[in-house]
Amino acid sequence: MGTPHLQGFLLLFPLLLRLHGASAGSLHSPGLSECFQVNGADYRGHQNYTGPRGAGRPCLFWDQTQQHSYSSASDPQGRWGLGAHNFCRNPDGDVQPWCYVAETEEGIYWRYCDIPTCHMPGYLGCFVDSGAPPALSGPSGTSTKLTVQVCLRFCRMKGYQLAGVEAGYACFCGSESDLARGRPAPATDCDQICFGHPGQLCGGDGRLGIYEVSVGSCQGNWSAPQGVIYSPDFPDEYGPDRNCSWVLGQLGAVLELTFRLFELADSRDRLELRDVSSGNLLRAFDGAHPPPPGPLRLRTAALLLTFRSDARGHAQGFALTYRGLQDTVEGRASPEDSTESLAGDPDGANASCSPKPGAAQASIGARVFSTVTAFSVLLLLLLSLLRLLRRRSCLLAPGKGSLAMGPSRGPGRSWAVWYRRPRGVALPCPPGDSQAEGPAAGYRPLSASSQSSLRSLVSAL
């Protein structure tokens, strides 16, 4: 009877340790693009060929390109992401990431990188436009100053969901039904530079680069479980005297925000985060006080974001991802992120982002509690096992010799094990001991595996 319980205990032990290790939980970032700027200047991925999945030409290492304009030596602070690697980057603000390649017979020594994961959220892709019928069936127009945001703004004012740029100067508007019947084209087909911005691509010949008009909007109500909010006029720079607001509502007990890009001109350009129900200021960031680099969790059911720029403000702006979390171990906001504890901070400066004195102690306390709980369960299981085994007044397990039922003869020596509450004591049985001869007759010899398990258990006591 004791052996099956012992084997069950040994099988449960790794499982309990695994559960204890998982008690802290983990958070996974949303599966979004690796790029949040339209030209991929923020790409920090690991593609090192000009094509996806090893297609195209291999890139040269940035620390071996000193003969060219850009190398790791020209980026000592790592601002452009260059270093002792050969990953695609965009150090000069070109229309998309690129890399140096071994010079070809045509004298070409660099190539653009086709990176499927480097398309800013809100960009839906490159599509064929044959003109009959047009890929997007709404109104259209042309401009010699066309940028992505100029087209987005035009279609937003017309009340359409989608905006498409083509051939560097043409803009088309459409709806979701147009996209459903659209024909995707290779991403590299949309390679025409926008007439109004040298760092943006505006489709190609007979190719539409299609965007959601919500990109760079100045207001909106967001209820999707997760998504992205851009500063006004994005991917262009935000303009002066902007006063914009967005509402995130009913996404969960906790909201998690992560700033993927934050570049404001100065301290007079400011982003505020407020609880909708109370109006309390939760956080505030500006050009002099940027947000923390990691996820920011706020205990609020609905959040109001307000952005204001002064009369001179011009900068790239911001891009943030959000997602709603339930009030569980995985999504629980820390006390300093709660609405009540932040309501008294009118400035929203960086002091509100730093950990409070009790945060580390609370985290340690939680870990200690989970550890004590797990080992309490292990102790209860061990005590239950000992109670079952206590029915035997003596278990005989020989040493290196053969099993002897009774007094030891020869080099082997018998052992009598008395289990008492709450622990066991192992003592050698002297020759002729009644404990070794009497009760042993009522029990079968232990198997080799049981002897090994018992020996391990005794040594641990």
From Swiss-Prot:
Protein name, entry field: Kremen protein 2
Domain CUB per the UniProt entry, residue ranges: 218-325
InterPro entries the record matches: CUB_dom, Kremen, Kremen_rcpt, Kringle, Kringle-like, Kringle_CS, Kringle_sf, Sperma_CUB_dom_sf
Positions of region (Disordered): 329-357, 429-452
Any single GO BP term: negative regulation of ossification
Record topology, Extracellular segments: 25-363
Key word Disulfide bond present: yes
Chain's gene name: Kremen2
Segments forming domain WSC: 120-214
Record-annotated disulphide pairs: C35-C118, C59-C99, C88-C113, C218-C244
Free-text note regarding domains: Binding to ERLEC1 is mediated by the oligosaccharides linked to the kringle domain.
N-terminal signal peptide: 1-24
Residue positions the entry lists as glycosylated: N48, N221, N243, N350
PROSITE patterns named among the record's database cross-references: CUB, KRINGLE_1, KRINGLE_2, WSC
Source organism: Mus musculus
